[in-house]
Amino acid sequence: MRIILLGAPGAGKGTQAQFIMEKYGIPQISTGDMLRAAVKAGSELGLKAKEIMDAGKLVTDELVIALVKERITAEDCRNGFLLDGFPRTIPQADAMKEAGIKVDNVLEFDVPDELIVERIVGRRVHAPSGRVYHVTFNPPRVEGKDDMTGEELTTRKDDQEETVRKRLVEYHQMTAPLIAYYSKEAAAGNTAYHKIDGTRKVTEVSAELATILG
């Protein structure tokens, strides 16, 4: 069960990734975590990555693919894995294919931009505890105050509307070609592509994923 997740920030991808990991016992592979782990372990690939990063350069696709290949041979990937945040570009997707990394399912979480903006911009945080509220979906008992301490709630910088809209534009620019790429791959019988309606309740989305993944 080798899965790629696609979806804008706020589309509910993280919540469903957790569900898939727990239900099917497969790890989520994040390229950022992988790079940090390789550097820390001092492996041959890790040392190469460190050299590039220390020079302030971006790690090459070839190196990331090599790390992914190495990572998926680990024991915890025996039943599959979940790739989040990779591939980001067509050359990366092509490189994965050339490296023989087969993908069984591509899951795209589809939520209209306006709903994503509402979901993210409405978040309020109690910074000391990390408790998160939402002005519409999960409001505090007293507006603008933490339920437990009565302290002031704040908005994270990343949750401000201008930032969210900018991230959405970037997401669509980057992901539209990937959606087309994997739709074509699915039509050729090389993978299965599923567009998931992410506007529904978390439990409904999870139930659909369980049906798709079996």
From Swiss-Prot:
Is Transmembrane helix one of the keywords UniProt gives this record? no
What the protein does comes down to:
Catalyzes the reversible transfer of the terminal phosphate group between ATP and AMP. Plays an important role in cellular energy homeostasis and in adenine nucleotide metabolism.
Question: What intrachain disulfides are recorded?
Answer: none
Q: A GO BP term, please?
A: AMP salvage
- What does it catalyze? AMP + ATP = 2 ADP
Residue numbers spanned by region NMP: 30-59
Residues binding AMP, per UniProt: T31, R36, K57, L58, V59, G85, F86, P87, R88, Q92, R156, R167
Annotated residues that bind ATP are located at: G10, A11, G12, K13, G14, T15, R123, V132, Y133, R200
The cross-references to Pfam families, in alphabetical order and at most eight, read: ADK, ADK_lid
Q: What the record says about its domains?
A: Consists of three domains, a large central CORE domain and two small peripheral domains, NMPbind and LID, which undergo movements during catalysis. The LID domain closes over the site of phosphoryl transfer upon ATP binding. Assembling and dissambling the active center during each catalytic cycle provides an effective means to prevent ATP hydrolysis.
The top EC class is transferase
Example of a GO cellular component annotation carried by this entry: cytoplasm
Among SUPFAM superfamilies, the record links this protein to:
P-loop containing nucleoside triphosphate hydrolases
What's the encoding gene here?
Answer: adk
Write one Gene Ontology MF term. ATP binding
Q: What name has this protein been given in UniProt?
A: Adenylate kinase
The family database entries (HAMAP family) matched by this protein are listed as: Adenylate_kinase_Adk (MF_00235)
Pathway connected to this protein? Purine metabolism; AMP biosynthesis via salvage pathway; AMP from ADP: step 1/1
Which keywords, in A-to-Z order, does the entry hold? Answer: ATP-binding, Cytoplasm, Kinase, Nucleotide biosynthesis, Nucleotide-binding, Transferase
Which stretches does the entry tag as region LID?
A: 122-159
EC number(s) reported in the record: 2.7.4.3
Q: Identify the species of origin.
A: Erwinia tasmaniensis (strain DSM 17950 / CFBP 7177 / CIP 109463 / NCPPB 4357 / Et1/99)
Q: Where does this chain mainly localize? A: cytoplasm
* Listed InterPro entries: Adenyl_kin_sub, Adenylat/UMP-CMP_kin, Adenylat_kinase_CS, Adenylate_kinase_lid-dom, P-loop_NTPase
Q: How does it assemble?
A: Monomer.
Cellular compartment(s): Cytoplasm
